[in-house]
């Protein structure tokens, strides 16, 4: 359906301060800091979807929102000419209780890289990039038919699609980040990016890594695929000893390249189980609506269908693999000869574009990145 949906004429309103220390309840007067404008005829979904089906794919757009790991000092600096971007960061300051913009602009990088900081930072920067895109190419927002976000990026995608208000979405991200930071500090764990090949057996490698950990006296060791990126490329999360074992034995498992990721824990595994309840309590206390644009879940790769579906899967996402490769197939799979929509990665980094190229080269040919570093340029007259 069209983003009558999500015209990024985001409506800004003021709201009062709240105690930043409590995660039990949402801001008492948190109004729609970034409510996406809704058309009065939005209830006529069947008619809207029929219109979307008639629109040529080349006139449609897809927005992709990045996740943790793409943060860099200076992000957001190219967007501050836009008044609404400054309002985003001012609102974020109130929700978070600290100056997120200052941290993003000046760092230091090691503070920005902490899970508790980088998840809100990427969330806000990505929605700021949507503002830039709307400023430069408003038709892209109006013609958006689908959105997806990688891990924490899924929250930004849902805010863009009108399923959550900005303030409450950020409040949920804050709770998620703090709970995941605490869980990651309980067990020495991490994430390993693995580029394999056709004969690579990721599951078998993980099982042998678990057995190695047991031989070291580690009880209930964790080692499993946590991100499906593109064919033959996975991220494996778990105990550090398991990941080190895989690196030492990469030739045995036909791994072409391995790299430890700069994250604080074994995300998207059962090691994050302690983070689920705090997040679910917050998700249960905020207003979640049916998305006005199709948003695809990391857990299933399929579209969300209703608010309870969103709550359930956002909680599961913390301890489940990110099925990004499957999501890309779900969005872009089509008959031979059919056109592809334009794709925009909104936020820091271009990792999702690189992954799209490996999943579907034809779809990637219509890919663009909305940078959050460079100074904004007005559209050509």
Curated annotation (Swiss-Prot):
EC number: 2.3.1.39
Biochemical pathway: Lipid metabolism; fatty acid biosynthesis
Cellular location(s): Mitochondrion
BP terms from Gene Ontology: fatty acid biosynthetic process; mitochondrial small ribosomal subunit assembly
Reported phenotype of the disruption mutant: Conditional deletion in retinal ganglion cells leads to disruption of retinal ganglion cell axons.
Keywords: Fatty acid biosynthesis, Fatty acid metabolism, Lipid biosynthesis, Lipid metabolism, Mitochondrion, Transferase, Transit peptide
CC annotations in GO: mitochondrion
InterPro entries: Ac_transferase_dom_sf, Acyl_transferase_dom, Acyl_Trfase/lysoPLipase, Malonyl_transacylase_ACP-bd, Mitochondrial_malonyltrans
Keyword Transit peptide attached: yes
Alphabetized Gene3D superfamilies for the sequence: Malonyl-CoA ACP transacylase, ACP-binding, Malonyl-Coenzyme A Acyl Carrier Protein, domain 2
Tissues and organs where the protein is expressed, per its UniProt entry: Expressed in retinal ganglion cells.
Domain of life: Eukaryota
Name of the top EC class for this enzyme: transferase
Known catalytic reactions: holo-[ACP] + malonyl-CoA = malonyl-[ACP] + CoA
Main subcellular location of this protein, as a coarse class: mitochondrion
A Pfam family of this chain: Acyl_transf_1
Active site, per annotation: 151, 268
Modification N6-succinyllysine, positions: 312
GO molecular function: [acyl-carrier-protein] S-malonyltransferase activity
Its job: Catalyzes the transfer of a malonyl moiety from malonyl-CoA to the free thiol group of the phosphopantetheine arm of the mitochondrial ACP protein (NDUFAB1). This suggests the existence of the biosynthesis of fatty acids in mitochondria.
Family: Belongs to the type II malonyltransferase family.
Protein's name according to its UniProt entry: Malonyl-CoA-acyl carrier protein transacylase, mitochondrial
Source species of the chain: Mus musculus
């Amino acid at each position: 359906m069209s983003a009558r949906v999500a015209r990024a004429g985001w409506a800004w309103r003021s709201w009062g301060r709240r105690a930043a220390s409590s995660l039990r309840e949402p801001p008492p007067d948190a109004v729609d800091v970034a409510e996406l404008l809704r058309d009065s005829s939005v209830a006529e979904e069947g008619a809207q979807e029929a219109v979307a089906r008639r629109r040529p794919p080349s006139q449609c757009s897809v927005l992709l929102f990045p996740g943790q790991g793409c943060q860099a000092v200076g992000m957001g600096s190219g967007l501050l000419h836009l008044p609404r971007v400054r309002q985003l960061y001012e609102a974020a300051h109130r929700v978070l209780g600290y100056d997120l913009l200052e941290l993003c602009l000046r760092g230091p990088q090691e503070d920005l890289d902490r899970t508790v900081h980088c998840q809100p930072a990427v969330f806000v920067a990505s929605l700021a990039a949507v503002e830039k895109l709307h400023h430069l190419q408003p038709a892209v927002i109006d013609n958006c038919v689908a959105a997806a976000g990688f891990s924490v990026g899924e929250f930004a995608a849902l805010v863009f699609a009108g399923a959550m208000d900005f303030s409450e979405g950020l409040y949920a991200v804050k709770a998620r980040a703090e709970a995941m930071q605490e869980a990651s500090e309980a067990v020495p764990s991490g994430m390993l990016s693995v580029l394999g090949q056709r004969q690579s057996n990721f599951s078998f490698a993980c099982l042998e890594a678990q057995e190695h950990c047991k031989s070291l006296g580690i009880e209930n060791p964790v080692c499993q695929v946590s991100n499906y990126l593109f064919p033959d490329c996975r991220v494996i999360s778990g105990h550090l000893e398991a990941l080190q074992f895989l690196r030492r034995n990469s030739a045995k498992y036909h791994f072409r390249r391995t790299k430890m990721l700069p994250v604080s824990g074994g995300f998207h595994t059962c090691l994050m189980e302690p983070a689920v309840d705090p997040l679910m309590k917050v998700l249960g206390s905020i207003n979640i609506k049916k998305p006005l644009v199709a948003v695809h879940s990391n857990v299933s790769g399929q579209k969300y269908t209703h608010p309870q579906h969103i709550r359930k899967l956002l909680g599961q996402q913390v301890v489940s693999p990110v099925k990004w490769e499957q999501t890309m197939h779900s969005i872009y799979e089509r008959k031979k000869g059919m056109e592809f929509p334009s794709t925009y990665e909104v936020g820091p980094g271009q990792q999702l574009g690189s992954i799209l190229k490996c999943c579907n080269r034809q779809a990637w040919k219509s890919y663009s990145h909305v940078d959050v570093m460079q100074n904004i340029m007005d559209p050509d007259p």
